[in-house]
Design a protein with these regions (language model features):
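Polybasic, low-complexity association/targeting segments
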Residues: 21-58
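Conserved, well-ordered active-site substructure
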Residues: 233-240
Length: 240
């Protein structure tokens, strides 16, 4: 069934070419200096292949809700996901969308100086001018009113969102949006899940922010739940 992804309009980058690339469950919305859809599909296959083979041999990797050790010779994507999961204390699949977005983006940077890859609301970007990323929080009063301003010198960067109310990804919390910024999109993805899991009521926002601050490698957090918002870190929120 097709799921309308309204948040895909929420990055201001009209000077770049937009295109989609999909393989199986992976459905990416990409912006680059030119249409790289063929290259993007090839990159997705290159990234997914080793992960799929690893999961066939280690099915626990797919289902675990806790960090798992992996072999030193495990595929790069598995290593990235496992490391992010250890830092955030979640299962490795909590990092998969961010990891795929980043690894595909890194491959596309060979053909484009600027790349923005969105994978289910999780974003990897390397840009050469200031970009605005709208904060999408479902039916919250904050949706459509706030954006993250990202300076090019801070990229490459991961900007990932976990929600207990929007999207298909597993969340044990009820946050409208738990947004985490980190140089590693895999870590941002895993940490967004961990932070979002802590939010059961509006009263949990401050504690979730404090927990997120303790995760090594995180540079910024925004949590929106109902009428409450909390933020921390090296971020710039602007009104839209």
């Amino acid at each position: 069934m097709y799921e309308q992804r309204t948040y895909r309009r929420d990055i201001k980058a009209g000077d770049l070419v937009s295109f989609q690339a999909a393989v199986k469950e992976t459905d990416l919305y990409i912006r680059a200096s030119r249409d790289l859809s063929v290259e993007a599909v090839a990159a997705i296959n290159d990234v997914r292949g080793p992960l799929e083979r690893y999961i066939r041999e280690h099915p626990v990797f797919l289902h675990s809700l806790e960090p798992l050790p992996v072999e030193k010779d495990a595929p790069d994507i598995v290593q990235r996901m496992a490391q992010a999961a250890r830092l955030a204390n979640v299962g490795p699949m909590a990092a998969v969308a961010g990891a795929v977005a980043q690894m595909v983006g890194e491959k596309l940077l060979q053909s484009s100086a600027e790349v923005i890859v969105e994978n289910g609301g999780d974003i990897y970007l390397k840009v050469s001018r200031k970009r605005m990323i709208a904060v999408y929080a479902g039916d919250s009063v904050f949706t459509g009113k706030l954006a993250l301003e990202v300076e090019p010198g801070r990229t490459p960067l991961g900007v990932c969102t976990s929600s207990g109310k929007v999207g298909p990804s597993l969340s044990l919390g009820i946050a409208d949006a738990a947004v985490v910024i980190a140089p590693s999109a895999a870590l941002a993805d895993a940490a967004a899940t961990a932070v979002g899991n802590m939010v059961k009521t509006e009263k949990d926002v401050d504690a979730a922010i404090e927990f997120g601050r303790s995760i090594k490698g995180i540079s910024g957090i925004v949590i929106i739940t109902g009428g409450k918002m909390g933020a921390w870190g090296d971020i710039k929120l602007v009104k839209t």
